[in-house]
Amino acid sequence: MAGWQSYVDNLMCDGCCQEAAIVGYCDAKYVWAATAGGVFQSITPIEIDMIVGKDREGFFTNGLTLGAKKCSVIRDSLYVDGDCTMDIRTKSQGGEPTYNVAVGRAGRVLVFVMGKEGVHGGGLNKKAYSMAKYLRDSGF
């Protein structure tokens, strides 16, 4: 899936993200392309199922993981028509900084972006939304 790396590169180009990924969530349920060396590279099918699953409440209470990194769900509009995004924040383990994460849902793929320290979640949400809309409009 080397062609998908250009989408990740596009998400990274403005310098506000430390990581980005394109992840299949239908039949090809795995990471299609991701920033090298990041946590998104390690996202598992079980983690994908948690994000796109029918239970839209459990992760507010229990959190979720992305590439084994513990996270809290801030806002879930993944299945809201016209939005199709989710806002997440990493949890601090051992005093390291926390980061905003946004997920955008297209027809067959999820777009993940993680901001650098201090990057506001609203801009990340717009970035994930825009790429997911472009991919959805392109048949993905």
Curated annotation (Swiss-Prot):
Keyword Acetylation: yes
PROSITE patterns in the cross-refs: PROFILIN
Superkingdom classification of source: Eukaryota
Tissue expression notes: Highly expressed in brain, skeletal muscle and kidney and less strongly in heart, placenta, lung and liver.
BP GO annotations: modification of postsynaptic actin cytoskeleton; negative regulation of actin filament polymerization; negative regulation of epithelial cell migration; negative regulation of ruffle assembly; positive regulation of actin filament bundle assembly; positive regulation of actin filament polymerization; positive regulation of ATP-dependent activity; positive regulation of peptidyl-serine phosphorylation
Localization annotation: Cytoplasm, Cytoskeleton
Alphabetical keyword list: Acetylation, Actin-binding, Cytoplasm, Cytoskeleton
One MF annotation (Gene Ontology) recorded for this entry: actin monomer binding
Keyword match Acetylation: yes
Signal peptide extent: none
Modification type N-acetylalanine: residues: 2
Record Pfam families: Profilin
GO cellular component labels: cytoplasm; cytoskeleton; extracellular exosome; glutamatergic synapse; postsynapse; presynapse; Schaffer collateral - CA1 synapse
Record-linked PANTHER family: PROFILIN, PROFILIN-2
Job description of the protein: Binds to actin and affects the structure of the cytoskeleton. At high concentrations, profilin prevents the polymerization of actin, whereas it enhances it at low concentrations. By binding to PIP2, it inhibits the formation of IP3 and DG.
Family membership noted in the UniProt record: Belongs to the profilin family.
Assembly description: Occurs in many kinds of cells as a complex with monomeric actin in a 1:1 ratio. Interacts with PFN2.
The protein's name: Profilin-2
Native organism: Homo sapiens (Human)
Classification of source organism: Eukaryota, Metazoa, Chordata, Craniata, Vertebrata
Annotated gene: PFN2
